[in-house]
Design a protein with these regions (language model features):
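Penicillin-recognizing serine hydrolase domain
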Residues: 2-5, 14-69, 81-102, 107-109, ...
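Acidic/histidine-rich, surface-exposed loop or edge segments in extracytoplasmic proteins
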Residues: 59-77, 110-118, 166
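N-terminal Sec/ER secretory leader and immediately downstream segment
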Residues: 103-108, 114-116, 125-127
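Active-site SXXK
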Residues: 112, 122-152, 164, 278
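A glycine-rich, coil/turn loop motif that links secondary-structure elements
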Residues: 119-124, 153-154, 197-205
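Conserved catalytic neighborhood of penicillin-recognizing serine enzymes
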Residues: 145-186, 193-195
Length: 311
């Protein structure tokens, strides 16, 4: 005789078995999918973590939508700026001005490598030669032969040095050269490898570049006098030449020179661990203050800084 009270147990048992098998299938499917994701090219830890966290909650469809793009899907990088072919650009600019004399010298102050372009024979140096006069006077101060506090003209020598460099005073220049003595100035220049006659005031762009390089590397003067002279070569009364054409982030110390068709700028340019003496000497039939001459010097400067500093 059977017990009617036990019959309902059979269907319940079958349902439990079905549920167990369904759960097993779901777990197996999860394992398969996780294995595929882990071995798929381009999958990353973010995707695996997301799938492990969300798959068993039934949010499988969101995985593909929330997966971060792999490297192949990243936005393309901006193309690098083309390198400046400096010799070609210098020749292009110089060749476009056949009625001008143009000489450019570039000296790397770290390794002494010198590059020159155009006509680098001596030019009337105009006021760029005032840097040589200043260096000679500071040298005499360091040897004890001169004093910055000594009267010179209506002021003292220190005042005249600053006026000569920072505001390009010709009166101060004459006072300082006479106090040094023209033969002594010539002799001092010779110790630096520069042939210089104050009466003629002729200097080659390459010699001016060497002078600036020796100044900035501390080979001419002591640290205090070097810093003082370089300080006078910033924020001068004419910043329209090289300083007006350099990019932000490039430090400029310079001495310009303008006289009778000659327009020059002798500069030290530095950024980071790079430093160059850059000298641009020009002569032309046009007015020295003409827009064309400014454009010429600015164009040269843009190409130079683009090649030297990438900006």
């Amino acid at each position: 005789m059977t017990n009617p009270g036990l019959r309902p147990a059979a269907p319940t048992h079958r349902r439990n078995v079905v549920l167990v098998w369904a759960a097993a299938v779901l777990v197996l499917a999860a394992v398969v999918v996780l294995g595929a994701i882990r071995t798929a090219p381009g999958s990353d830890s973010h995707t695996r973590d997301f799938l492990t966290r969300d798959f068993l909650t039934g949010d499988v469809l969101n995985v593909a939508q929330q997966q971060e793009p792999g490297p192949a899907e990243s936005a393309p990088a901006a193309p690098a700026a083309a390198a400046v072919d400096l010799p070609a650009e210098m020749q292009r600019i110089i060749g476009a001005h056949p009625d001008h004399r143009i000489g450019v010298a570039v000296l790397d102050t770290r390794d002494g490598q010198l590059q020159s372009y155009g006509d680098v024979a001596p030019y009337t140096a105009a006021s760029t030669a005032k840097v040589l006069t200043a260096a000679a006077y500071y040298h005499l101060v360091e040897t004890g032969d001169k004093s910055l506090d000594a009267p010179l003209g209506a002021f003292n020598a220190a005042f005249q040095l600053k006026a000569m460099i920072n505001t390009s005073s010709d009166d101060s220049w004459l006072l300082l050269m006479r106090d040094i003595g023209y033969p002594n100035l010539t002799a001092y220049a010779a110790t630096l490898g520069i042939t210089y006659d104050p009466e003629q005031n002729l200097v080659a762009p390459t010699d001016m570049a060497r002078l600036l390089a020796q100044l900035t590397t501390g080979k001419l003067l002591n640290a205090d006098h070097t810093a003082e002279l370089l300080g006078y070569m910033q924020h001068t009364n004419d910043e329209d030449l090289v300083p007006a054409a350099v990019a932000p982030g490039i430090t400029v110390h310079h001495k310009y020179g303008v006289v009778q068709g000659y327009v020059h700028d002798a500069a030290l340019l530095s950024a980071g661990d790079r430093s160059y003496a850059v000298v641009i000497y020009t002569w032309g039939p046009d007015d020295a203050d003409s827009a064309d001459r400014l454009d010429l010097i600015h164009d040269l400067t843009h190409q130079l800084t683009g090649a030297l500093f990438g900006q």
